[in-house]
A protein has these predicted regions:
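N-terminal mature ectodomain segment of secretory-pathway/periplasmic proteins
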Residues: 18-94, 122-130, 136-139, 143-151, ...
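Short, well-ordered beta-strand elements
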Residues: 166, 286-294
Length: 310
């Protein structure tokens, strides 16, 4: 009887301790788990009326984070991260590598980073608990302080602190996008696939195109918490004209801004919002600006109009 009571106490104590944890503590534990744990997650992504199954592997090999993301439907498409290098492998083009700290297309990069940096833009609120993928989960809401971005909610596994479900919501709580784990396996060692990825000779990181003199575009306004992450040149599909590309993020939402000489490139003309992904076009002086991102259309329009050339 004494042994049984000790076992029950060992099971109850962690859950009791979790009752006193703040929403930020839960998120900090998630951040550490995403960086440090060895695991395999099978997921489904609901986006724009489509269901997309994914498999995500994560592990540590010789002190380096290794991750692998596979899209299970459609043409083969994978992404591999070794340290801060991400390589994209697609069926219709040669593999290529870029510098990136996390894999895109799954959880927000901020989830594995400094959670405190999100506090300037989002309020963390502890929600209820529910069962997801056969595991008890604690829900945390991330509510924006203004209407320039959407809100989010995430359910964390109460044992591993890994995310089990992630929702993007409008101000009136309409679901725009969802990522849900259907099976989560915590591993004791890196799977063979990640060991091979660590040893493999991936393509070198591609060089950014040289920036043209005078193309110093600046923003007179950005929503609080957003900053410029990258600047380079892109070539639009079907066009030989280079356009200026500026990538913005607040850690949760990402925005892409494209700038071209008016009439030089076939930029989209319509305004649209579809399942959280918005697109706007604006004319700024002699330039055409396209802004694309999972934020309200009004935010994109204001960002595009605030561009100035210095």
């Amino acid at each position: 009887m004494r042994v049984i009571l000790l076992v029950l106490a060992a099971l109850v104590f962690p859950a009791a301790a979790q009752e006193d944890m703040s929403a930020k503590t839960w998120l900090n534990n998630m951040s550490q788990a995403l960086r440090d744990k060895e695991f395999k997650a099978s997921l489904i992504q609901l986006q724009a009326g489509h269901v997309r199954p994914l498999v995500y592997l994560h592990g540590i090999v010789n002190g380096q984070e290794i991750a692998f993301l596979e899209y299970l439907n459609g043409p083969p498409k994978n992404a591999v991260r070794v340290g801060n290098t991400v390589t994209f492998i697609e069926h219709d083009q040669a593999p290529y590598s870029v510098v990136a700290g996390r894999l895109q297309g799954i959880w927000p990069a901020a989830f594995a980073g400094d959670i405190g940096a999100l506090e300037t833009s989002y309020q963390f609120i502890l929600g209820g608990r529910s069962r997801i993928a056969g595991r008890p989960g604690q829900m945390i809401r991330l509510l924006p302080y203004d209407n320039s971005r959407y809100g989010y909610q995430v359910w964390l596994d109460m044992e591993t602190y890994l995310p089990l479900r992630f929702d993007m919501l409008t101000e009136d709580r309409q679901l725009l996008e969802q990522l849900m784990v259907i099976e989560l396996l915590e591993l004791q060692e890196p799977p063979a696939l990640l060991l091979e990825a660590y040893k493999h000779e991936w393509p070198p990181v591609i060089d950014q195109a040289e920036r043209q003199e005078g193309q110093n575009w600046q923003f007179a306004w950005l929503p609080k918490g957003f900053s410029v992450l990258i600047r380079d040149h892109h070539r639009l599909i079907g066009s030989h004209e280079a356009v200026e590309y500026i990538g913005l993020s607040d850690g949760m939402a990402s925005i892409s801004v494209y700038v071209a000489r008016a009439g030089s490139s076939p930029l989209p003309e319509e305004l649209l919002t579809r399942n959280g992904l918005s697109l706007v076009t604006e004319k700024v002086g002699n330039a055409e600006v396209v802004a694309l991102g999972k934020v309200p259309m009004e935010t994109l329009s204001r960002i595009a109009k605030s561009l100035t050339l210095e």
